[in-house]
A protein has these predicted regions:
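Positively charged n-region of N-terminal signal peptides that target proteins for export
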Residues: 1-4
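Bacterial N-terminal signal peptides
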Residues: 6-19
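Eukaryotic scaffold repeat domains enriched in small/polar residues
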Residues: 21-376
């Protein structure tokens, strides 16, 4: 009986220790302001980013995409909008009006040269605008809805490409051939686990760059589950990754960020971890204990930090926090929780962190962008 009691006490102590460990992440004090930007309503804020002058860019899902019908094609467009604000929050202009790629917002980023990049999961494109909003580069291709005529008097064969990133048929898009990309629908992405290489995407989720200007696209919301690398001119170089839970495998990539040392941090949401790679795709380490990473960001400055949001279900009040992490993987602290009030978060899909204490976060479920200031 005494032996059983000792075992019970030991097990209880282990459980208590685990509970204490789980609660040992320090809380970071912070302030937040959701009323800075002048537009009254965005819709779902999928992306928020700032440039070196303090201007704020918001890429939001403002409504269902419209369909323009033609004799041969149906074009889906207009489901999202990209807004620019000055440092005081005053609306400056809208960027990308009428651009074919703007359909279903997924992310916006600003590179070191102040170019503005959007990632669109509906058109399966990554688009670069210069600092003045002029279109400079397009990666990927939006599959068309085309009526193919097979000959005089022959019935038409319809290639149907639905809007907002849903699966297309295997024939749609440039990526149908072997060794090309996901094209934009599940049919072109191949069976789960294949990680098909190429320069087309299947619902891309994020983009980042290294110091040489190479471009890295997280091709992660479809079933490609890979990172695609391009030169700064937009030429495809290589890709790595496939569906799975091992090193270098992914289960829904929701974000990617790079630090000055060339490390790439990949939010592997389905596996509840952040994987770290070099620029050639060599696995280096992984970070766990941070929930389900949704949005990630690496701060500037002499001592960079990684920020990662814990994705929360719309009805959940158990998480939704943002973690502050050293590049070594050490968790410094966390702040925030799920909710709709100021200083609470409703699925943070975007984090901008020019410094370690001044952040912007974009929220899907609360339809807003909050400016967050961490207290020193």
């Amino acid at each position: 009986m005494r032996r059983l009691l000792n075992v019970f006490v030991a097990v209880a102590a282990l459980g208590l220790g685990a509970s204490l460990f789980a609660q040992s992440v320090p809380e970071i004090n912070y302030d937040a302001n959701a009323d800075i930007l002048s537009l009254p309503s965005f819709g779902e804020v999928a992306g928020v980013a700032t440039n070196s002058k303090g201007h704020v860019f918001v890429y939001a899902r403002t409504g269902h995409a419209a369909a323009t019908l033609g004799d041969e094609r149906t074009f889906y467009h207009g489901g999202s909008r990209l807004f620019q604000f000055d440092p005081a929050g005053k609306f400056v202009k809208e960027i990308g009006q009428g651009v074919y790629s703007v359909n279903f917002a997924q992310q916006v980023r600003v590179d070191p040269q102040d170019n503005v990049w959007i990632v669109d999961a509906g058109s399966n494109m990554v688009v670069k605008f210069d600092a003045d909003g002029r279109l400079q580069l397009v990666l990927g291709r939006k599959p068309e809805n085309i009526t193919l005529r097979t000959g005089p008097g022959m019935p038409a064969r319809q290639i149907d490409v639905p809007p907002e990133g849903r699966g297309a048929t295997a024939e749609a898009g440039r990526g149908g051939g072997a060794g090309r990309g996901g094209g934009g629908g599940r049919g072109n992405a191949g069976a789960p686990g294949t990680g098909i290489p190429g320069d087309n995407f299947n619902r891309p989720s994020d983009v980042t760059w290294d110091r040489a200007g190479n471009i890295y696209v997280a091709d992660g919301y479809g079933n490609n589950n890979r990172i695609a690398k391009f030169t700064k001119e937009g030429n495809f170089q290589k890709s790595w990754g496939q569906t799975g839970s091992g090193q270098g495998q992914f289960n829904q990539i929701r974000g990617i960020a790079a630090d000055a040392a060339g490390n790439l941090y990949v939010a592997d949401a389905g596996n509840k971890r952040i994987q770290v790679f070099d620029g050639e795709g060599t696995f280096k380490s992984q970070i766990t204990g941070i929930g389900t990473p949704q949005a990630i960001c690496v701060s500037g400055g002499a001592t960079p930090y990684l920020f990662s949001s814990n994705s929360n279900d719309p009805e959940s009040i158990e998480n939704g926090e943002i973690y502050k992490i050293r590049p070594t993987g050490q968790i410094v602290g966390k702040f925030g929780k799920a909710g709709k009030l100021p200083k609470e978060f409703g699925i943070v899909n975007a984090i901008d962190c020019r410094t370690e204490n001044d952040l912007w976060v974009g929220e899907i479920w609360n339809w807003r962008a909050q400016k967050v200031t961490l207290r020193r």
